[in-house]
Amino acid sequence: MKRKYLSLGLALVMALTLCACGGGAVNGTSTGKEDGKLASGTWQQQETGDTDLLSYSAQDLTGPIPEDWTLPSDFKTGDKVRVEVSGDKILYGDIVDGGYLNGFTVAQYADGNLTTVYEFKKGVVRSWQQFFSPDGSKLAVAWAPSTDSTEWSVTLVDLTTSGESTLKLPDMTFTYTQTDEETGESKEVTEAPTFLLLKWQNDKNLVVTASLAEYDSSKQPQTWVYTLP
């Protein structure tokens, strides 16, 4: 029998994402405009899939918010609000049951005021993912239409223009042979990834890893690097 693996990182991801919540969905909108300017880059599959899935999770889901910021009195904070800060920009959204966001807002901070730069409500976003590029000028968002969907999309956002680019993903499905332990019969199975994980390598390169909930030597995670144009 093939040995199956479930890494610590993947266990964390499962704890935060898997939810029998009736397949909640959002309204499929955002304030950005699809201009596709970041969609003409190139994909390169890596020889070995990344199994360090914890490295794709943000270390602090609540900020940290700079100590010298004075946020508006109605700004919510706490364990149920996802916050990420980059320079003078702050991303925030309510974390709902199952550890996901039904959209989020990006605002610019100045003198105690927040000015909305961008809002995302296209689909379900996992609260633990990292969003801002290192220089804070772009966002990367992995999302699905609902909590129980594996129809993944990746959207890049240029925060200087609010222009969106939905990337054309390479084939990230998993095809493997499954054997029935009782009958011994084998069949070929094709599955979409359970998880699609993102992290910025630098301002020009985005690392994308697709993984099943359980994997062995025949269905290791797939890792790709997307180089922006």
Model-derived regions: residue spans:
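Positively charged n-region of N-terminal signal peptides that target proteins for export
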Residues: M1-Y5
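Signature of short aromatic-glycine-proline-rich micro-motifs recurring in repeat-based ectodomains
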Residues: K76-V81, Q129, T183-K199
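Surface-exposed loop/turn elements that mediate protein-protein interactions on large endomembrane-trafficking
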Residues: Q45-S73, G103-E119, T155-F174, P221-P229
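Bacterial signal peptide processing site
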Residues: G22-G24
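Blade-terminus and WD-like Trp-Asp/Gly-His loop motifs, strongest in beta-propeller folds
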Residues: R82-D88, Q130-K138, L198-L206
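Beta-strand C-termini and the immediately following turn/loop, strongest in propeller blades
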Residues: W43-G49, S86, L91-G99, V141-T147, ...
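C-terminal motif of bacterial Sec signal peptides marking the signal peptidase cleavage site
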Residues: T17-A20
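Beta-strand-rich domains and repeat architectures in extracellular enzymes and scaffolds
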Residues: D35-L53, P66-I95
